[in-house]
Design a protein with these regions (language model features):
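Extended alpha-helical targeting/anchoring segments
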Residues: 2-8, 14-174, 178-533
Length: 533
């Protein structure tokens, strides 16, 4: 049972409490602390929490329990436990509100609005949930969790409406001067929404260091004592839920057809050459061309996520189950992070497969750093990152903290850099996402023209691929990864999407093979050993 403290007095909550197997747990911060905070009238809500000794072995065990009581769940974690973000895995269920954008309509709960400016509508919603940074709390205490699709870009860039809108038909003027390149006909539309977020005011944080759980409930700061008592009661309900034996459920899924690609090898190579014509004519410098692969699938992606954790541990591991979509992923790359006013983005570009021995691994890393084409591509994307952060950062604050480091993952290695800035007064997490998305590593340069051509040349919409996935905290902090190395399921099909950066001297066959190689960890997690058709 959780108890709360006022000044020096600990008081057991009133009302009937659920039975638990644990001794009373102290709730923090105290009611006295939040009473003082409420008087400041700066914030509308605040988190309260209690710590719970856990019988769960992994965050996945907690997730399995939550799925017995809610279809809508998420798990955000990091396989890099040495990093600060890796200490906690975050879970949630039963969202307070769902927000999604589909068919040019924004849905906020039961309210439908024309999707003219979805970002501003979400900003207005978040103003109702303004929370302080409190000591001894994890980095995420509640907020929005979900994804923003690549095509969401058209809401802030009206010039892209034709290219990224309802179809992939070519917009007027999207071929380079002197060329006859035409758009590839769309073969099927990616079923992901333009935006799919869930608002959670309760969070379960799994401490990977101590294997304890931190249970978090956000309470309103008006009538603070009443809401504090209610919050403590809700914490006790969480304790009871987590101590209730969960029935076993089948979490395995199976690919039931060959995986087919939107582009055949010949089509992809021909499209690379058409992109290179635009580069040679000075229309763009680089473009990331992608290929979508899909298959029929039965069952859940939870088992697939478990395999991804094992074979492709990454800085951003995520499982997300929304109204009509299930997503599992292991992204290596941050889109943008905002923590207490400091912005970071981490461009990754340039790829080699991992070696089979330490010596071969080192040799491939040296080869990658010596590759002028790969380094030139990476430098271009670092410059894009600096420019993106510069639009919302204080003058002179944008710096490259780390340059041309080798970042190694389970199957591949990349060249990585770190760009930092300090966000200007008047800008927020939503502005930061808008400034950086889509990442140059998933679009090209110049970014807007590259995106226009992507809409022209690619056969299907990208959806989550190349978009953003993560959280925006009630405190204003935010951490979003790039939507890559992911698998999602909808309407009985799974989708895997990978891309390659095309520059003037790219070899088309090599770029096609890079797309297939990047998909290998996803295929392995799905248990698929066949060829791509």
């Amino acid at each position: 049972m959780c108890t709360y403290t006022t000044d020096n007095t600990r008081t057991t909550t009133t009302g009937t409490q659920p039975h638990t197997q644990h001794a009373p747990r102290e709730v923090f911060p105290t009611l006295d602390t939040l009473t003082h905070l409420a008087r400041e009238q700066t914030y509308t809500i605040a988190p309260i929490a209690c710590e719970l000794d856990s019988h769960f072995t992994t965050p996945l065990d907690v997730l399995r329990m939550l799925q017995t009581v809610s279809h809508h769940v998420y798990l955000l974690e990091s396989a890099r436990q040495a990093h600060a973000r890796g200490r906690y895995s975050f879970l949630g269920f039963n969202p307070k509100l769902t927000i999604f954008c589909e068919n040019e309509t924004l849905h906020i709960g039961d309210v439908e609005l024309p999707a003219r400016n979805p970002t501003e509508a979400i900003r207005q919603l978040l103003r109702k949930y303004k929370s302080p940074h409190l000591p001894n709390m994890p980095s995420f205490t509640g907020g929005l969790v979900g994804y923003i699709a690549f095509e969401y870009l058209r809401y802030k860039e009206p010039t892209l409406t034709a290219a990224l809108g309802a179809t992939n038909a070519a917009a007027p003027g999207t071929t380079a001067p002197g060329t006859t390149a035409t758009a590839n006909p769309p073969i099927q539309q990616t079923p992901a929404r333009d935006l799919d977020l869930m608002l959670f005011d309760k969070v379960i944080a799994f401490d990977n260091k101590t294997h304890k759980l931190i249970l978090i409930v956000n309470i309103k700061l008006n009538h603070v004592e009443e809401h504090y008592r209610k919050g403590v009661f809700e914490l006790n309900e969480l304790v009871h839920l987590l101590n209730t034996p969960a029935p076993l459920r089948n979490e395995e899924g199976h690919v039931t057809s060959p995986i087919t690609a939107a582009f055949t090898k010949q089509e992809f190579c021909n499209t690379v050459r058409r992109v290179q014509t635009h580069i040679q004519n000075g229309d763009i410098f680089q473009l990331v061309l992608s290929n979508q692969m899909s298959a029929r699938f039965t069952g859940s992606l939870l088992g697939t996520y478990r395999e991804l954790r094992r074979i492709n541990p990454s800085p951003y591991m995520f499982y997300f189950c929304g109204t009509d979509i299930e997503v599992a992923g292991a992204s290596p790359e941050t889109l943008v992070e905002l923590k207490e006013g400091v912005l970071h983005t981490y461009p990754l570009a340039g790829t080699r497969p991992r070696g089979t021995t330490p010596q071969e691994d080192d040799a491939r890393a040296a080869e990658l750093l010596a590759d002028k084409k790969e380094c030139a591509e990476h430098n271009m994307l670092v410059d894009l990152g600096r420019n993106d952060l510069g639009r919302i950062s204080t003058f002179g604050s944008v710096v490259v903290e780390k340059f041309h480091a080798i970042e190694k993952f389970s199957h591949v290695m990349h060249i990585g850099s770190t760009v930092r800035g300090h966000i200007q007064h008047g800008f927020d997490a939503l502005d930061a996402i808008a400034a950086v998305m889509p990442a140059g590593t998933l679009s090209g340069a110049p970014k807007i023209r590259a995106c226009e051509l992507i809409g022209t040349f690619e056969k299907v919409k990208r959806g989550i691929y190349g978009g953003a996935l993560g959280y925006i905290d009630f405190t204003g902090n935010m951490d979003m990864c790039i939507g890559i190395r992911l698998i999602y399921k909808k309407a009985g099909r799974v989708f895997v999407h990978t891309g390659a950066g095309i520059v003037a001297d790219s070899i088309p066959e090599h770029e096609f093979n890079e797309c297939i190689h990047k998909a290998k960890s996803s295929f392995a997690a799905l248990g698929y050993t066949g060829e791509v058709e």
